[in-house]
C-alpha cells in the first residue's frame, strides 16, 4: 500500500468553473393558453394528414420521417406505430416503389427504427453479379443518402449493409462538393456524415433539421410551422425545469463548498434532456438531473481530489445508505452525503403517492454499485498505481462509465408502468446496457486518457490494453473504435431481436443515453471542457427560440 504521505497528495484536475452560473434562475416563462390552442389546432391538422395518406405510400413514409426528424412524432405515437406495423406486415408483398433506392431504404430504416426486423435482403436487387452495389446508383444522391442512413440500423454480420455503408460513403463524399451551397440535400449529407440519424440526439437533430427542412423547396408548410411552435413551447417547459434545478443547486452551494469538482448542472440537464425531452417526462428529468450531477461530483471526488484515507469511509457510508453513518464520513463530505440521501428520499416521497416508491430501491442499488466501481479505481491507484489486467479493468470500467446507473435510474420517475421484471432485467446488465456502457467508456477513454495521465491518475482501458497486448496507442484506438461500432450494432439487435420482451420506451432510453455520449465525446470531452461546442448546443436548445 502507498504511504500515508502519498495519500495526502491530492490529484487536482483544475476543471474550469461553470459556464452558466445561475443564468437560468430567471427563466420562468409560462406557456400561454393561446400557444396551447394554436399548437393543438395544428396537431389535429397534421394528424388528419397522416391518417389520410395512403398506407405504405411514399407520401406517408416521407411524412413520418419528417415528423420524427422535426421532433414532433411524439404527438402521434399511436398513429405512427399503426402505420409502421401495417408497412411491416405488407413488406413481403410486391410494391410499386420496390426498385426506388430512396423509398426502399427509407421504408427499411423507418421499420427498423420502430423495432421491427425487416430483412436486409430488400437491398439485393441493387447488387450486381460481382456482389457490389450497381454503379448506376451513384447519380441518385437522395437514394444514396437514404441507403447511408439505413446502413446504420445494421446488426452484426449483415454484410450487405456493411457494403452499403462503404459504397454510399465513398460516392457521397465525392458528390457532396459538387452540390450547390443552397441545396438542402448538401446540408443533409454534411449533417449525416457528422451525425447519422440513428446516432443523433432527438432535440439537437430537430433543431438542426428545422433549418434544413425549411430550405427544402418540397417541405410541408403546415408541418414546419407546427414543428417551430412545438419546439418553442417545449423550450419554455425545459427552461422552467432548469430554473427549478438551478435554484436547488444554488441552495446546495456545491460550487463554493467543493470548488475542485466540475460545476456542470446545466450540462447535466442537457444530458438528461437528450434521454427524454417530452413533457410527460418532466418529473423524471428533474430527478435524473440531480442524480447525475451527484454522480459527476462523486466521480471528481474519487478521481480528482479525495485521499484514499477519506474515500474508504465515504464509500462505506454510501454502501450503508443510512443517515446514522454520517459521523463516519470525512467532515467536508458530510454535506454531500446528506444531499445524496435527500435526493433519493424526495424521490421516494414523490413516488409513494402513485405506489411506485419501490422503484427507488433499484436506483440506490445502481448508485452504490457505481460508487464501488469508483472506489475500486481508487484502490488500484493507491496500490502504487497498480495497472490491472485489461479484462479486470474492463468489467469495472463498464460500471464506472455510469451508464448502468443512468439506464436504470432514468426509469424511476416516469409515469409509465414498469414491471419489477423489467427493473431486474436492467440491473442484470443486459446486452443493450453493456453495449451502451462499453461505448461510453471507450469514447471517453479515447478522447480523455492522455489528459488524465498528466496528473496522478489510474490507468485507463487504453493503457491496460496497450500493456497487456503489447500494442501501440494507435492500434488500441482502432480496437476501441471497432468496439464502439460493434456496440451500436448490438444496441440495434436488442431492438429487433431482444432476448427478453421489454417495453420499447425502455430500450429507447438506453439508445438516447448512447446518443448523448456519441454527441459529447466524438472529438473531445465536451462535458469537462464545456466552453465551446457544448455551450453552443445549450444555447440552441435552451436559450434561443426558433424564429417562426
From Swiss-Prot:
Residues making up the signal peptide according to the UniProt record: none
Q: What is one process in the GO biological process aspect for this record?
A: terpenoid biosynthetic process
**Catalytic activity as recorded in UniProt:** (2E,6E)-farnesyl diphosphate = alpha-humulene + diphosphate; (2E,6E)-farnesyl diphosphate = (-)-(E)-beta-caryophyllene + diphosphate; (2Z,6Z)-farnesyl diphosphate = beta-bisabolene + diphosphate; (2E)-geranyl diphosphate = terpinolene + diphosphate
Binding-site residues for Mg(2+) 1, renumbered to this chain: 299, 303
- Name the Gene Ontology molecular function terms of this record: magnesium ion binding; terpene synthase activity
Give the motif span (DDXXD motif): 299-303
CDD domains per record: Terpene_cyclase_plant_C1
Q: In which tissues is it expressed?
A: Mostly expressed in leaves, to a lower extent in stems, trichomes, flowers and roots and, at low levels, in fruits.
What this protein needs as a cofactor is: Mg(2+); Mn(2+)
Q: Which residues bind Mg(2+) 2?
A: 299, 303
Give the pathway listed in the UniProt entry for this protein.
Secondary metabolite biosynthesis; terpenoid biosynthesis
Question: How many and how are cofactors bound here?
Answer: Binds 3 Mg(2+) or Mn(2+) ions per subunit.
Its top-level enzyme class, in one word, is: lyase
Q: Which Pfam families match?
A: Terpene_synth, Terpene_synth_C
Key words, A-Z:
Lyase, Magnesium, Metal-binding
Q: Where does Mg(2+) 3 bind?
A: 444, 452
Might you give the EC number(s) for this enzyme? 4.2.3.106, 4.2.3.-, 4.2.3.104, 4.2.3.57
Described by its record, this protein's role is as follows:
Sesquiterpene synthase involved in the biosynthesis of volatile compounds. Mediates the conversion of (2E,6E)-farnesyl diphosphate (FPP) into (1E,4E,8E)-alpha-humulene and (-)-(E)-beta-caryophyllene, and of (2Z,6Z)-farnesyl diphosphate ((ZZ)-FPP) into beta-bisabolene, gamma-curcumene and (Z)-gamma-bisabolene. Can act with a low efficiency as a monoterpene synthase with geranyl diphosphate (GPP) as substrate, thus producing beta-myrcene, (E)-beta-ocimene, limonene and terpinolene.
**Domain description from the entry?**
The Asp-Asp-Xaa-Xaa-Asp/Glu (DDXXD/E) motif is important for the catalytic activity, presumably through binding to Mg(2+).
Annotated family: Belongs to the terpene synthase family. Tpsa subfamily.
Q: What is this protein called?
A: Sesquiterpene synthase 12
Q: Which organism is it from?
A: Solanum lycopersicum (Tomato)
Amino acid at each position: 500500500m502507498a504511504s500515508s504521505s502519498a495519500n495526502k497528495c491530492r490529484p487536482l484536475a483544475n476543471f474550469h468553473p461553470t459556464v452558466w452560473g445561475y443564468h437560468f434562475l430567471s427563466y420562468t416563462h409560462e406557456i400561454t393558453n393561446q400557444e396551447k390552442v394554436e399548437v393543438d389546432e395544428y396537431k389535429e391538422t397534421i394528424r388528419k394528414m397522416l391518417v389520410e395518406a395512403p398506407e405504405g405510400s411514399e407520401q406517408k413514409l416521407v411524412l413520418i420521417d419528417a415528423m420524427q426528424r422535426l421532433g414532433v412524432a411524439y404527438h402521434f405515437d399511436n398513429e405512427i406505430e399503426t402505420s409502421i406495423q401495417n408497412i411491416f406486415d405488407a413488406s413481403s408483398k410486391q410494391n410499386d416503389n420496390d426498385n426506388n433506392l430512396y423509398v426502399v431504404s427509407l421504408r427499411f430504416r423507418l421499420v427498423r427504427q420502430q423495432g421491427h426486423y425487416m430483412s436486409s435482403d430488400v437491398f439485393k436487387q441493387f447488387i450486381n453479379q460481382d456482389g457490389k452495389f450497381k454503379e448506376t446508383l451513384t447519380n441518385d444522391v437522395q437514394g444514396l443518402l437514404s441507403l447511408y442512413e439505413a446502413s446504420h440500423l445494421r446488426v452484426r454480420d449483415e454484410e450487405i449493409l456493411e457494403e452499403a455503408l462503404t459504397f454510399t460513403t465513398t460516392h457521397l463524399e465525392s458528390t457532396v462538393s459538387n452540390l450547390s451551397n443552397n441545396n438542402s440535400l448538401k446540408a443533409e449529407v454534411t449533417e449525416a456524415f457528422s451525425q447519422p440519424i440513428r446516432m443523433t440526439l432527438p432535440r439537437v437533430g430537430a433543431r438542426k433539421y428545422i433549418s434544413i427542412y425549411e430550405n427544402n423547396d418540397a417541405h410541408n408548410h403546415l408541418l414546419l410551422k407546427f414543428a417551430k411552435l412545438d419546439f418553442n413551447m417545449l423550450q419554455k417547459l425545459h427552461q422552467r425545469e432548469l430554473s427549478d434545478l438551478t435554484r436547488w443547486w444554488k441552495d446546495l452551494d456545491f460550487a463554493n463548498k467543493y470548488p475542485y469538482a466540475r460545476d456542470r448542472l446545466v450540462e447535466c440537464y442537457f444530458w438528461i434532456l437528450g434521454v427524454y425531452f417530452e413533457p410527460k417526462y418532466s418529473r423524471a428529468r428533474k430527478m435524473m438531473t440531480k442524480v447525475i450531477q451527484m454522480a459527476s461530483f462523486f466521480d471528481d471526488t474519487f478521481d480528482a481530489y479525495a485521499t484514499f484515507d477519506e474515500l474508504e469511509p465515504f464509500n462505506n457510508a454510501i454502501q450503508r445508505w443510512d443517515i446514522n453513518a454520517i459521523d463516519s464520513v470525512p467532515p467536508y463530505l458530510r454535506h454531500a452525503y446528506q444531499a445524496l440521501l435527500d435526493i433519493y428520499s424526495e424521490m421516494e416521497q414523490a413516488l409513494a403517492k402513485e405506489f411506485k416508491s419501490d422503484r427507488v430501491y433499484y436506483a440506490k442499488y445502481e448508485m452504490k454499485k457505481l460508487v464501488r466501481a469508483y472506489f475500486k479505481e481508487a484502490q488500484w491507484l493507491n496500490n502504487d498505481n497498480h495497472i490491472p489486467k485489461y479484462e479486470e479493468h474492463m468489467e469495472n470500467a463498464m460500471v464506472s462509465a455510469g451508464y448502468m446507473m443512468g439506464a436504470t435510474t432514468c426509469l424511476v420517475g416516469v409515469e409509465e408502468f414498469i414491471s419489477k421484471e423489467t427493473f431486474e432485467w436492467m440491473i442484470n446488465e443486459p446486452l443493450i446496457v453493456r453495449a451502451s456502457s462499453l461505448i461510453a467508456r471507450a469514447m471517453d477513454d479515447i478522447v480523455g486518457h492522455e489528459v488524465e495521465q498528466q496528473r496522478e491518475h489510474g490507468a485507463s482501458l487504453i493503457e491496460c490494453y496497450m500493456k497487456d497486448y503489447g500494442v501501440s496507442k494507435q492500434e488500441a484506438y482502432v480496437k476501441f473504435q471497432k468496439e464502439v461500432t460493434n456496440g451500436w450494432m448490438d444496441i440495434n439487435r436488442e431492438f429487433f431481436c431482444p432476448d427478453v420482451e421489454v417495453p420499447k420506451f425502455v430500450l429507447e432510453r438506453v439508445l438516447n443515453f448512447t446518443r448523448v455520449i456519441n454527441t459529447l465525446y466524438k472529438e473531445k470531452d465536451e462535458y469537462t471542457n464545456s466552453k465551446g461546442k457544448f455551450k453552443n448546443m445549450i444555447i440552441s436548445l435552451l436559450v434561443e427560440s426558433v424564429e417562426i
